[in-house]
Amino acid sequence: CYGDLLQHLTGSKDHNVALREAAVRQGLSVSEYGVTVVESGEVRTFATEEELYAFLGYAFIPPELREAAGELEAAREGRLPVLVEPGDLRGDLHSHSTWSADGKGTVAEMAAAAHARGHEYLALTDHSHYLREGRLEAQAEEVAAVNARLAPFRVLRGIEANIRADGSLDVADETLAGLDWVVASLHTAFDSSPTERILAAIENPHVDCIGHLTGRRLSRRREADVDVERVAARAAETGTSLEINSQPDRLDLRDAHA
């Protein structure tokens, strides 16, 4: 009954409760030990989760979707979404190198790692306040050298600009215009009109993406009170991307947003 036990321990709890309640309506009892046909007392066990879900009338539900958020109905009706897998990724559009204090690798090291993964590009988006006084231009020379060595792989010249309290960015428009990819993010004053500030950043024609939209840091900082639907609607109108930041302490946008 490995499949039964694996499914039970994988959870989530809410998903398992919903699964068991649905099974009861079919005259079945689901536990980590197997599926019992209530009328006959017969116990069925399964070697895999796939076999268990199929017996209950569902397509296999990936663990990431097991949140009691309509996935059982979707699995029964063949409407489960196709999940993005690592092999689907063509590149990373938000990265920090040692040009920023929070970066761990050099431009060359990061580009080599991305290239080794089969990616086609890497956007270098170091924090704007570390790229002043000629440092952005010096970084451009380093990027050019890496690109010459790894072509056709390409490091995109970018930046992560701060959205100020008044909604303006801390980088001049003429500087942003010369870059390949611009991320704008909230890093301060999270309680000061975050929705309006993000909307102002979206209106900047040089901004390609809003980074970690709500600014949350799990176990460290709650998410800002951002009207996600309003922001998403305007982003769609302007063609501005909203980042899904998969850093374990961010997960921002959240799965429900995506």
Language-model features: locations:
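Metal-associated gating/positioning segment near the N- to mid-region
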Residues: A101-L131
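C-terminal structured "cap/appendage" subdomains that terminate the fold
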Residues: I244, P248-L251, D255-A258
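Phosphate-backbone recognition surface of nucleic-acid-processing proteins
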Residues: C1
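Active-site mouth loops of central-metabolism enzymes
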Residues: D92-E109, S185-D191, R221
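Residue-level detector of anion-binding/catalytic polar loops
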Residues: S29, E120, S241
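Conserved short loop/turn motifs at secondary-structure junctions
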Residues: V38-S40, H127-E133, S246-R250
